[in-house]
Curated annotation (Swiss-Prot):
<keyword id="KW-0808">Transferase</keyword>
<keyword id="KW-0963">Cytoplasm</keyword>
<dbReference type="GO" id="GO:0006400">
    <property type="term" value="P:tRNA modification"/>
</dbReference>
<dbReference type="GO" id="GO:0005634">
    <property type="term" value="C:nucleus"/>
</dbReference>
<dbReference type="GO" id="GO:0005737">
    <property type="term" value="C:cytoplasm"/>
</dbReference>
<dbReference type="GO" id="GO:0016438">
    <property type="term" value="F:tRNA-queuosine(34) beta-mannosyltransferase activity"/>
</dbReference>
<dbReference type="GO" id="GO:0006417">
    <property type="term" value="P:regulation of translation"/>
</dbReference>
<keyword id="KW-0328">Glycosyltransferase</keyword>
<dbReference type="InterPro" id="IPR051862">
    <property type="entry name" value="GT-like_domain_containing_1"/>
</dbReference>
<comment type="similarity">
    <text>Belongs to the glycosyltransferase group 1 family. Glycosyltransferase 4 subfamily.</text>
</comment>
<keyword id="KW-0539">Nucleus</keyword>
<dbReference type="GO" id="GO:0007417">
    <property type="term" value="P:central nervous system development"/>
</dbReference>
<comment type="function">
    <text>Glycosyltransferase that specifically catalyzes mannosylation of cytoplasmic tRNA(Asp) modified with queuosine at position 34 (queuosine(34)). Mannosylates the cyclopentene moiety of queuosine(34) in tRNA(Asp) to form mannosyl-queuosine(34). Mannosylation of queuosine(34) in tRNA(Asp) is required to slow-down elongation at cognate codons, GAC and GAU, thereby regulating protein translation.</text>
</comment>
<dbReference type="Pfam" id="PF00534">
    <property type="entry name" value="Glycos_transf_1"/>
</dbReference>
<dbReference type="Pfam" id="PF12038">
    <property type="entry name" value="QTMAN_N"/>
</dbReference>
<dbReference type="InterPro" id="IPR001296">
    <property type="entry name" value="Glyco_trans_1"/>
</dbReference>
<protein>
    <recommendedName>
        <fullName>tRNA-queuosine alpha-mannosyltransferase</fullName>
        <ecNumber>2.4.1.110</ecNumber>
    </recommendedName>
</protein>
């Protein structure tokens, strides 16, 4: 028992990561708070954990997400402050798109900066997350009226590294409709290839490249598979933007079968304003006004304040809705993703995108903003630059759903798997004990 895991917001991807580490890494002890009232967790969790965590001289490493004010806990519990402290950023508050700025909102980003200063290693789930945080520190601190601290980026940056969120891709074969099975088998074969060619995440910040081009991501597929693909596919340009949609001609299901069912769009995100549901529903309502046929599943968790647009859109979309609301059963959730054709993100605040990668694993065609973390994760063909371009892509897919159903994902999800990242997490959490313990 040497690794102390602390999660102040034990839900969603935060829960997934802690559960995975707790299951896969020996000697872990996990302390959590439920994923409710995020703002209160960020303000007060340190005081709770000060009392809840039992003293134990076997602890050598403390691993926590950035929801916790690590600086407070380190002072309140000097025994924990002496541990090797690792801070993991799922998201950062320095660029959070608040609807109405209030002075108290400053505290959340400020807490994260303080936590970085006391941490020994600061880990981000993407290069975008790391760079957006570090380069925003100076601007963020300008909100302080006077006597501002200096050079904090230079102090924090040497501690920083990128270690992607480790995905566990479950067996979904039982949920796949017939037209997805061939493509998914091919994708599985590609995922099982040697992953030594994948972009290397590094625990040394100075070795971390933060530029991920479309060509770099595409190159991970390999030349031999690309040659085979060129021999077995045809391309049809049905996107108004000019982006090619690649068809898998080896799949022999009849085109008229693919064309029968309306396009099924899924939106599997938190029901909160930072995921920009307004843009998503405006695009869908425009499709409906044009009398285009489609089905939609709106999944994802809900919290205390649900934007009004959800209740309004539910009424307006009417019979187009197949699923509406959070699916607590993981199997039900995966089945809903497997039945969908296209997964859409309209997020204004995203640093990795677990839900999008889960949907891609289930055979969905991803459509993401050409911003935030998405260019780091997805090839350019899956990115859109504006709501109008998103509308045009969905309009064309509504007219030709068979094109989407023939498509095979052109990226590489294997580099985000636990199998690819296990070694780096083990190295991170197997740090040598400090001499002063």
């Amino acid at each position: 028992m040497s690794v102390l895991l602390i999660e102040a917001f034990y839900g969603g991807s935060h829960k997934q990561l802690m559960d995975l580490i707790n299951q896969e890494i020996e000697g872990c002890v996990l302390y959590t708070l439920p994923a409710k009232k995020w703002h209160w967790r960020a303000r007060t969790a340190a005081l709770y954990f000060m009392q809840a965590i039992l003293p134990d001289d076997k602890y050598r490493v403390l691993f926590t997400s950035s929801v916790l004010n690590l600086a407070e806990l380190a002072v309140l519990r000097p025994d924990l402050g002496k541990l090797k402290k690792i801070l993991y950023f799922h998201e950062n508050q320095l660029i959070y798109p608040v609807q109405k700025t209030q002075e108290r909102d400053f505290q959340y980003g400020y807490n994260q900066i303080l936590s970085c200063l006391v941490a020994d290693i600061v880990v981000f789930n993407s290069a975008f997350n790391m760079e957006s945080f570090l380069t925003s520190i100076k601007t963020f601190l300008k909100k302080i009226p006077d006597h501002r601290p200096k050079n904090l980026e230079e102090i924090i940056r040497p501690k920083c590294c990128v270690l992607y969120f480790p995905m566990t891709f479950p067996d979904i074969s039982q949920f796949l409709p017939e037209h997805k099975r061939v493509s998914h088998t091919l994708a599985d074969n590609m995922s099982s290839m040697d992953i030594s060619h994948c972009p290397k995440t590094s625990l040394q910040a100075e070795n971390m490249s933060v530029e991920f081009s479309h060509d770099q991501i595409q190159s991970s597929i390999g030349e031999s598979s690309a040659e085979q693909e060129r021999a077995t596919i045809s391309e049809k340009n049905i996107c108004a933007s000019g982006d090619p949609v690649i068809l898998n001609a080896s799949n022999t299901l009849a085109g008229d079968i693919r064309q029968k069912k309306p396009l099924h769009i899924v939106w599997p995100h938190r029901w909160e304003h930072d995921k920009d549901p307004e843009t998503f529903f405006k695009v869908l309502l425009k499709l409906k006004e044009k009398e285009l046929t489609f089905h939609v599943s709106v999944l994802g968790e809900t919290f205390t304040d649900v934007p009004d647009i959800f209740s309004e859109a539910r009424i307006t979309l009417g019979s187009s809705v197949l699923h509406w609301g959070y699916l607590a059963s993981k199997d039900d959730y995966l089945q809903a993703l497997c039945m969908a054709d296209v997964v859409v993100s309209t997020a204004k605040h995203e640093f990795f995108g677990v839900a999008m990668l889960e949907a891609v694993h289930c055979g969905c065609y991803p459509l993401c903003p050409k911003s935030l973390v998405y260019p780091e994760i997805f090839p350019a063909v899956y990115l859109y630059s504006s709501p109008e371009q998103l509308y045009r892509k969905l309009e064309n897919f509504c007219k030709r759903p068979d094109v989407v159903r023939r498509h095979r994902f052109q990226g590489d999800t294997a580099r985000f798997s636990w199998a690819a990242l296990r070694g780096e997490f083990r190295s991170l959490l197997a740090a040598e004990p400090r001499e002063d313990l």
